[in-house]
């Protein structure tokens, strides 16, 4: 993917309409553990007044769809294998998402590289969570790569989605210590527990209007966040 130069005279700070419904669409590909964290936060009124109105998966039997169904949320299977190209799939996905008129799109283990058309359509109102301390270890296999590098700290990051893969402005990070006896599996579980705490907080901030995307980067309460977020 390529970087995009954002022009300050064409992109304004993006926040949800304070008078409109705070509607969330979640995209998943697998088990949906971060989705469950969001569902739990919603049930305790900790999503800034937000409501998850739909969960969409590119994998027909993703367990995340079952989680949505059990929570009374519309669950939509849109298998990517039924489309000839990435562009065709993303075009169909855009149509499904827009039927739900979301204020925010949340990627929760959605294992697809998004097309520029898709990203630009929802720029500034789409968040992702990544299992590393970005900008370190963009892409896949983050835990194995961290262990191979012998790092002593690891973690996860919430960021706005842009055309650069895992390269959008970082909002929030959680750091943890890597033990000498950690394996990929133990490190994954440690990071995942932090993800479940972090993601609902970022979603809440966005829907409360505190967290914004701008041409300069992510802003919190009107102040530009540092490169590594909060």
Question: Which residues make up each language-model segment?
Answer:
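Donor/substrate-binding cores of folate-linked one-carbon enzymes
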Residues: 41, 58, 108-221
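Residue-level detector of anion-binding/catalytic polar loops
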Residues: 74, 103, 152
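N-terminal Rossmann-like dinucleotide-binding module
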Residues: 2-63
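Conserved acidic residues
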Residues: 53, 103, 124
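A short, charged, Gly/Pro-tolerant segment at domain boundaries
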Residues: 5-7, 213-230
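Short, surface-exposed acidic-centric catalytic microdomains
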Residues: 48-88
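Charged helix-capping and loop-helix junction motifs
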Residues: 88-94
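N-terminal glycine-rich "phosphate-gripper" loop used for MgATP/nucleotide binding
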Residues: 57-58, 81-82, 86-87, 100-116
């Amino acid at each position: 993917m390529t970087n995009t130069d954002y022009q300050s005279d064409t992109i304004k700070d993006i926040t949800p309409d304070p008078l409109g419904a705070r509607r969330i669409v979640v995209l998943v590909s697998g088990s949906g553990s971060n989705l469950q964290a969001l569902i739990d936060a919603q049930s305790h009124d900790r999503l800034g007044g937000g409501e998850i109105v739909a969960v969409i998966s590119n994998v027909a039997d993703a367990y995340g769809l079952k989680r949505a169904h059990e929570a009374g949320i519309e669950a939509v299977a849109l298998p990517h294998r039924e489309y000839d190209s990435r562009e065709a799939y993303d075009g169909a996905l855009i149509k499904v998402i827009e039927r739900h008129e979301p204020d925010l799109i949340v990627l929760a283990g959605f294992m697809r590289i998004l097309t520029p058309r898709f990203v630009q359509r929802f720029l500034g109102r789409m968040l992702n969570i990544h299992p590393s301390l970005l900008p370190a270890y963009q892409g896949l296999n983050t835990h194995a790569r961290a262990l191979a590098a012998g790092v002593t700290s690891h973690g996860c990051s919430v960021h706005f989605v842009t055309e650069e893969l895992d390269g959008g402005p970082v909002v929030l990070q959680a750091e943890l210590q890597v033990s000498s006896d950690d394996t990929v599996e133990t490190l994954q579980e440690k990071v995942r527990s932090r993800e479940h705490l972090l993601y609902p907080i970022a979603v809440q901030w966005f829907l409360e209007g505190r967290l914004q995307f701008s041409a300069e980067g992510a802003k919190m309460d009107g102040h530009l966040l540092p490169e590594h977020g909060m």
